[in-house]
Amino acid sequence: MPSVMSDDVSIHYEVKGQGSPVLLLAGLAGVGASWGPQIDLFAGTHQVIVPDHRGTGASAHTARAMSIAQHARDMARVIEAVGCGPVHVVGSSTGGAIAQLLAIDHREQLRSATIVSSIARADAFYRRQFDMRRRMLADSGLRASAEANALFLFDPMFMREHPEQVQAWVDTVSAGIFEPEIGFARIDMIVGHDAFDDLPSITTPTLVLVGARDFCAPPYFSAELAERIPGAEFVILEGGHLIFLEKPALLHGTIEDFIARHEQ
């Protein structure tokens, strides 16, 4: 399995397909495979790089240096190891925060940035939400937490129409292994993320996307991102926080249209 050392931590990644490179950055769970159908959709026309964040998946399981800035450095090392830069980065939620730091601190590695369902910085709502999610994990365990999180992460209409897909997601998450030190460090990492003041320095062509019924990172967070990033495009689609699973073709098509305009 391919991996690269980043500040003494092994970062695993997978590469699939051929064409202009797309780096997919997962959300809080950190496991690249969580992108589900998006991997094959992008691999149809692109070289897709899908890393596991430090502390997750096949990367080294450590809570050391758990920050968004460190994750951006890790992803810059992955791009260098594959030798494919500059890339089109697509990041969802926590991955979107990492994409912001790549565009701020490693802009030479990017052709474009797509930030999905993310935040520039936490506010009282976001902190309260993750304080609750942290307590759920600590007090009730992984399955109860996954059952509750589904209410934040999926569009209610999608849950109404596709309850079996939501339950399959809950079962997959619940089958994982929860390592408290790493899990809580990752929650602290996204709640502590704050790129607000640095966003105006971004020169990378940027698309900001969000689901209209995202209850984890409501659309006002994405509107703030788009307002702060010079020239950013802002699109609201029908869906929830996990819109890449709910509306895979719609999300993929929207991002592909943007990427096609920024291939050079």
Report residues per predicted region.
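Acidic catalytic loop of the alpha/beta-hydrolase fold
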Residues: 213-217
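Conserved HGGG/HGGXW glycine-rich cap/lid loop of the alpha/beta-hydrolase fold
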Residues: 7-61
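Short beta-strand/loop motif that positions the catalytic acidic residue
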Residues: 202, 208-210
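Catalytic histidine-centered segment of alpha/beta-hydrolase-like enzymes
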Residues: 240-252
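Active-site loop/oxyanion-hole signature of alpha/beta-hydrolase fold enzymes
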Residues: 49-90
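Catalytic histidine neighborhood in serine/cysteine hydrolases
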Residues: 223-242
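Flexible "cap/lid" loop of the alpha/beta hydrolase fold
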Residues: 100, 104, 111-140
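Conserved alpha/beta-hydrolase catalytic His-Asp/Glu region
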Residues: 124-126, 144-198
